[in-house]
Amino acid sequence: MKLALGILVASLFTFAANAQDSPFRKELKRADLTGTNMEVITSIAEIKPGDTSTLHIHHGEESFYILEGGTIELPDGKQVPFPTGVAAVNIRDTPHGAFKVVGDKTVKLLTVHVVDKGKPLYDKPPPK
């Protein structure tokens, strides 16, 4: 279950498959990592019922913590809980997202991305 949540969720934050940012995400802080060509981006994402996340990747790692949970619907139509208090990590260049928030609760996440500086935060997954 935790693996499925991690794969499907993280970045609930993308509105379009190749968007560089998301209408769901409010950036709180961005800083360069010392001695690297990477940066850390801390954000809050709020996804309202009916909002969807497209399949996407990040050029680095994304860690998230569910501040306020709800229910999500997977591409196959199955509805699963997305519970408050769960933490997960999406690894570099691993496709995730592709779900819809259902029910009456807005899902709220704290996200921390450690990504390659100068690359888009969100990108389309490569073709299979």
PLM regions: where:
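A short beta-loop-beta micro-motif enriched in histidine and acidic residues
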Residues: 37-38, 50-65
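Extracytoplasmic
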Residues: 37-42, 61, 77, 93, ...
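Glycine- and acidic-residue-biased ligand/ion/polar-headgroup-sensing regions
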Residues: 59-76, 84-86
